[in-house]
């Protein structure tokens, strides 16, 4: 029976996605203009929910296409303007450059990373110890590097492990070419493969949460930290000290949670590395060590020096993150002899689809701003006073960061609080305490969903996610114990007066000094 033109259109639309998903997206495109005509505010929230739905279906269809169609329509019907979308992208150019260049830069340091992490996994047999190592290493690195950079490193390592195992389990040798995305080979043991996928899922989730634990502590850990630090006129050390009454107890609670979920094998954790897989990885390590020439050793040395430059450059903020990433690409390729354009191009394959998706995400953020979707929440939070106000801001930030980008939420809130300070609604000391509540509120509860943490969203839409069956729902479920513990410990640190008392202690001992309103007036406005 010949295919009609309408059937061909439906077949082509969003490719191999399920039919119900195609119908859902077409329905959204029909409903949205009607709702916008009746009530723009409701239409704005509807768009946010629809966009979250496209992210949740990331394994069925990459969110760029359905999310992009919704964003294009939002601009077309007037929910926001092209100039506002461009302004959002402009304001977040550093994040986009980070994705384009830093992730590609990490690609050229893969050999060193695989070398280090393979040793970690093959030499340490205790799953609990390996999990704690991944979580604490990610937290430490995220305090000095950007969380996206760290998660890109861990993803590169996981893809390396997976492809090595898949190649050998499919009956090939380490040196053979192989497509590790295809499970058609007869030799693959399904049970073994599932256990290994589960093991990698565990490590990636521990590492992802680790980036949040470390990222909240310093002003370079997350993009919104830089914005908040600029508005409050804090330097690196002062930022870390002011955050510590909340971040230190939260860090230890997070590490303890990592231990508990592994020990009691709950929320999908506790999956062991199968013995056969461990043998393959150990054999690979021995194989690599045996055939490593002086050329290979020199490459590792060069990559180690570039790694030192990367950490120093980012920790001292010698240039914007994206530009440091570009320098990593240039140094790693120049000194390791990668001069072929095709070989260079491979490095960019992983990050560019996500960069495009993030640009679409900023279009949704533009709608949130133009339709003032968060305005009622902010006004409600400002109606409280004192310590209660800090708790309310922490909770309000946390809830909004679960559904929206935490960079955006943090930026909107700090600018609103700054406006309240300049209009005399709050004191300068209260502003400083609110800045801590906003920073911790945007960083910690946002681990709940991939929407809030860019590192989680990058993990969800990366090449490794479908290979290890890491879906949106599974990420939310595996993040749940961390979400509960981090959110509660964070709110208790503020609620029980720990933040106010410790901040007063820092003032009394002249560890930090009181700031004036003049500092805020003079500070760089990073407003959207």
UniProtKB/Swiss-Prot annotation:
<feature type="transmembrane region" description="Helical">
    <location>
        <begin position="52"/>
        <end position="72"/>
    </location>
</feature>
<keyword id="KW-1133">Transmembrane helix</keyword>
<comment type="function">
    <text>Na(+)/H(+) antiporter that extrudes sodium in exchange for external protons.</text>
</comment>
<protein>
    <recommendedName>
        <fullName>Na(+)/H(+) antiporter NhaB</fullName>
    </recommendedName>
</protein>
<dbReference type="GO" id="GO:0005886">
    <property type="term" value="C:plasma membrane"/>
</dbReference>
<dbReference type="Pfam" id="PF06450">
    <property type="entry name" value="NhaB"/>
</dbReference>
<keyword id="KW-0406">Ion transport</keyword>
<keyword id="KW-0812">Transmembrane</keyword>
<dbReference type="InterPro" id="IPR004671">
    <property type="entry name" value="Na+/H+_antiporter_NhaB"/>
</dbReference>
<feature type="transmembrane region" description="Helical">
    <location>
        <begin position="203"/>
        <end position="223"/>
    </location>
</feature>
<keyword id="KW-0739">Sodium transport</keyword>
<comment type="similarity">
    <text>Belongs to the NhaB Na(+)/H(+) (TC 2.A.34) antiporter family.</text>
</comment>
<keyword id="KW-0997">Cell inner membrane</keyword>
<feature type="transmembrane region" description="Helical">
    <location>
        <begin position="95"/>
        <end position="115"/>
    </location>
</feature>
<keyword id="KW-0813">Transport</keyword>
<keyword id="KW-0050">Antiport</keyword>
<feature type="transmembrane region" description="Helical">
    <location>
        <begin position="139"/>
        <end position="159"/>
    </location>
</feature>
<dbReference type="GO" id="GO:0015385">
    <property type="term" value="F:sodium:proton antiporter activity"/>
</dbReference>
<feature type="transmembrane region" description="Helical">
    <location>
        <begin position="349"/>
        <end position="369"/>
    </location>
</feature>
<keyword id="KW-1003">Cell membrane</keyword>
<feature type="transmembrane region" description="Helical">
    <location>
        <begin position="448"/>
        <end position="468"/>
    </location>
</feature>
<feature type="transmembrane region" description="Helical">
    <location>
        <begin position="248"/>
        <end position="268"/>
    </location>
</feature>
<keyword id="KW-0915">Sodium</keyword>
<feature type="transmembrane region" description="Helical">
    <location>
        <begin position="390"/>
        <end position="410"/>
    </location>
</feature>
<feature type="transmembrane region" description="Helical">
    <location>
        <begin position="29"/>
        <end position="49"/>
    </location>
</feature>
<keyword id="KW-0472">Membrane</keyword>
<feature type="transmembrane region" description="Helical">
    <location>
        <begin position="476"/>
        <end position="496"/>
    </location>
</feature>
<feature type="transmembrane region" description="Helical">
    <location>
        <begin position="304"/>
        <end position="324"/>
    </location>
</feature>
């Amino acid at each position: 029976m010949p295919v009609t033109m309408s059937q061909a259109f439906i077949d082509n639309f969003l490719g191999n996605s399920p039919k119900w998903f195609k119908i859902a997206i077409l329905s959204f495109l029909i409903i949205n203009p009607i709702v916008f005509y009746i009530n723009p505010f409701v239409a704005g929230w509807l768009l946010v929910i629809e966009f979250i739905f496209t992210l949740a279906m990331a394994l069925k269809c990459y969110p760029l296409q359905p999310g992009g169609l919704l964003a294009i329509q939002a601009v077309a019907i007037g929910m926001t303007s092209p100039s506002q979308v461009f302004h959002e992208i402009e304001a977040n150019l550093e994040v986009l450059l980070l994705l384009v260049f830093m992730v590609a830069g990490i690609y050229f340091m893969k050999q060193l990373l695989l070398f280090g992490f393979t040793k970690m996994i093959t030499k340490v047999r205790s799953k609990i110890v390996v999990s704690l190592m991944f979580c604490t290493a990610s937290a430490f690195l995220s305090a000095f590097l950007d969380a996206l950079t760290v998660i890109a490193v861990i993803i590169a390592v996981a893809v390396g492990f997976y492809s090595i195992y898949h190649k050998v389990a499919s009956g090939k040798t380490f040196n053979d070419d192989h497509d590790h995305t295809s499970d058609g080979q007869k030799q693959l043991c399904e049970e073994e493969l599932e256990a290994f996928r589960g093991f990698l899922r565990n490590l990636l989730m521990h590492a992802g949460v680790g980036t949040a634990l470390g990222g909240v502590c310093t002003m370079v850990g997350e993009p919104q930290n830089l914005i908040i630090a600029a508005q409050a006129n804090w330097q690196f050390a002062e930022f870390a000290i002011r955050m510590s009454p909340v971040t230190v107890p939260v860090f230890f609670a997070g590490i303890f949670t990592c231990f508990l979920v592994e020990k009691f094998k709950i929320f999908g954790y506790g999956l062991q590395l199968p013995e056969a897989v461990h043998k393959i990885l150990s054999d690979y390590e021995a194989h690599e060590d045996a055939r490593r020439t002086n050329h290979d050793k020199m490459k590792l040395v060069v990559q180690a020096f570039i790694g030192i430059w990367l950490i120093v450059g980012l920790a001292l903020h010698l240039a914007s993150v994206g530009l440091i990433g570009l320098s990593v690409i240039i140094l790693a390729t120049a000194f390791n002899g990668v001069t072929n354009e095709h070989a260079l191009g491979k490095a960019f394959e992983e990050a560019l689809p996500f960069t495009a998706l993030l640009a679409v995400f900023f279009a949704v953020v533009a709608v949130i701003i133009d339709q003032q979707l968060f305005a009622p929440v902010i006004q409600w939070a400002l109606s409280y006073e004192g310590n209660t106000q800090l708790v309310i801001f922490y909770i309000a930030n946390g809830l909004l960061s679960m559904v929206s980008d935490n960079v955006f939420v943090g930026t909107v809130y700090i600018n609103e609080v700054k406006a309240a300070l300049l209009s005399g609604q709050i004191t300068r000391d209260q502003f400083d305490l609110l800045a801590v509540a906003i920073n911790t509120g945007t960083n910690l509860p946002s681990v709940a969903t991939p929407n809030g943490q860019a590192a989680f969203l990058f993990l969800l839409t990366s090449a490794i996610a479908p290979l290890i069956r890491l879906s949106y729902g599974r990420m939310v479920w595996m993040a749940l114990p961390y979400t509960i513990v981090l959110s509660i410990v964070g709110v208790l640190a503020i609620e029980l007066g720990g933040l106010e008392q410790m901040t007063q202690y820092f003032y009394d001992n002249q560890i930090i000094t009181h700031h004036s309103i003049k500092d805020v007036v003079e500070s760089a406005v990073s407003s959207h």
